[in-house]
Amino acid sequence: MEIRRRPPNPKVRVAHLEYAVPHDDEEPRHILEKIVWEKDREIDAARDKVPLDNLKQQIAKLPPTKDFLGALQAAATKPAVIAEVKKASPSKGVIREDFDPVAIAKAYASGGASCLSVLTDKTFFQGGFDVLVEVRQAVDLPLLCKEFVLSPYQLFQARAAGADAVLLIAAILSDQDLRYLNKAAAALGLTVLVEVHDATEMDRVLSIGGFPLIGINNRDLTSFETDLATTERLLVDFNDRLKQQGVLLVSESGLFSRADLDRVQAAGAGAVLVGEALMRQQDVEAGLVQLIQAG
């Protein structure tokens, strides 16, 4: 899938005036492209508001990051669970009306999650870096910043907010971007979870190398439908290369029951990322315990 990083004819702002020459192809072609275009604008605005040097000063005062990958590898129950703090999504709208990220994070920690994932996109997922800060202050588990990362600046934002790991989405990044952002994340002590959706992206990531944690998103990026067979197919096709590189595989999206977890674990997934299934539970902790202990 091709993702154009910016509209072909972006608007230009001079003083209080904004203008652009009309263009037939200036609308995003699908939701992911729409998110990426908006994210580019958000990054520019964030840089103006909080300069990079300010983030570096905040980071200098923080303790070392927690071992996200190590926590997954050491999980007492398999597959290890990354539980997601998620209020909404573009495909489902608001998932949890009574969204209390601190209470949810504490429930996940008590329920046996190995790590947590926190959505930081405001526009489409109603998350935020402020949510990540709140969760960091509430729990000791390793935290993944779930964001549409396009710029190294966002890695500094994630680290300053308390993240231990960051998501890199292969579909929206070039090979050069993936290499550079992986190195930049490592320099900040951040673990990278690189996400793929199909065989082309998996081949790219494995060819680049240096990614011990790879996520397979079972959601089709154009239809937003989920299919756990995506994890099964990619693990069959790339099993040897994944083993050679010592990759821990995370299955993401479409996981709602212990049977789903057992299915992707049988295929070779060492961890799962579960969000919506838990967010819709009246008792989040009990829902997670049931999901983990049923195995």
Swiss-Prot record:
The reaction(s) catalysed by this protein are: 1-(2-carboxyphenylamino)-1-deoxy-D-ribulose 5-phosphate + H(+) = (1S,2R)-1-C-(indol-3-yl)glycerol 3-phosphate + CO2 + H2O
- Tell whether Lyase is among the UniProt keywords: yes
Offer one example of a GO biological process linked to this entry: L-tryptophan biosynthetic process
Pathway it acts in? Amino-acid biosynthesis; L-tryptophan biosynthesis; L-tryptophan from chorismate: step 4/5
- Tell me which InterPro entries the record gives: Aldolase_TIM, Indole-3-glycerol_P_synth, Indole-3-glycerol_P_synth_dom, Indole-3-GlycerolPSynthase_CS, RibuloseP-bd_barrel
Extract the Pfam families matched here.
Answer: IGPS (PF00218)
The enzyme class is lyase
Q: Which UniProt keywords apply?
A: Amino-acid biosynthesis, Aromatic amino acid biosynthesis, Decarboxylase, Lyase, Tryptophan biosynthesis
EC number, as in UniProt:
4.1.1.48
Any idea which GO molecular function terms this record carries? indole-3-glycerol-phosphate synthase activity; phosphoribosylanthranilate isomerase activity
Q: Does the keyword Amino-acid biosynthesis apply?
A: yes
The protein's superkingdom reads Bacteria
Provide the family line: Belongs to the TrpC family.
Q: Fetch the HAMAP family from UniProt.
A: IGPS_B
NCBIfam families in the record, alphabetically? PRK00278.1-4, PRK00278.2-4
The entry's protein name is Indole-3-glycerol phosphate synthase
This chain's source organism reads Synechococcus sp. (strain CC9605)
